[in-house]
């Protein structure tokens, strides 16, 4: 990173520092993702998702249903953290942890902060967040889910709803808002809402029936 002539000394220092941080993070991320153990960890959770047909949501889901040019995660540098819904969340957490325990020594499955959510860690790496979802609701979302590489992801409208909900809570974690909005813009770009123009709809029949009911 070269400093611009118009930069102050302090701004130049910051620019050099940011460039160094980016370089180090890329090197560290590449080392992690190329580690055979990390590759095995990712393969196991992805195979579990393919087998059980659970529905992924969250950042990884948004990223993976976007076209490659709009994806915000660099798969060569970042370890995916899968969040997924399950009608049997506790059992899934136990089963996934048992699968990992056959291969790795440091495996932990524990309850999350929110009721009905369970976290699975392998070698201190967060691998999965499993959230309970009522079976009827799960099946309804399942019908509109998107399959990418045999892994199911929540439909765009559900992901969109979750992001709008987060942006509507000023007493929540506002430090995430900028990141959430960037993702929302990308989702809306690739999966735009198609509204109905109410001005072109004919409501006359409905009004006629309503008037007849009042007369009787």
Which residue ranges define each predicted feature?
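Short amphipathic alpha-helical segments
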Residues: 69, 97-98
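N-terminal regions immediately upstream of nucleotidyltransferase
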Residues: 1-40, 198, 207, 214-215
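Active-site and adjacent loop segments of nucleotide-processing enzymes
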Residues: 49, 130-216
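Charge-rich, solvent-exposed alpha-helical interaction surfaces
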Residues: 20-23, 99, 103, 183
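Conserved catalytic core of two-metal-ion nucleotidyltransferases
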Residues: 98-139
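Active-site nucleotide-donor binding segment shared across nucleotidyl transfer reactions
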Residues: 38-88
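Short, conserved charged micro-motifs
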Residues: 90-97
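Generic detection of long, well-ordered alpha-helical segments
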Residues: 31, 35-39, 86, 90, ...
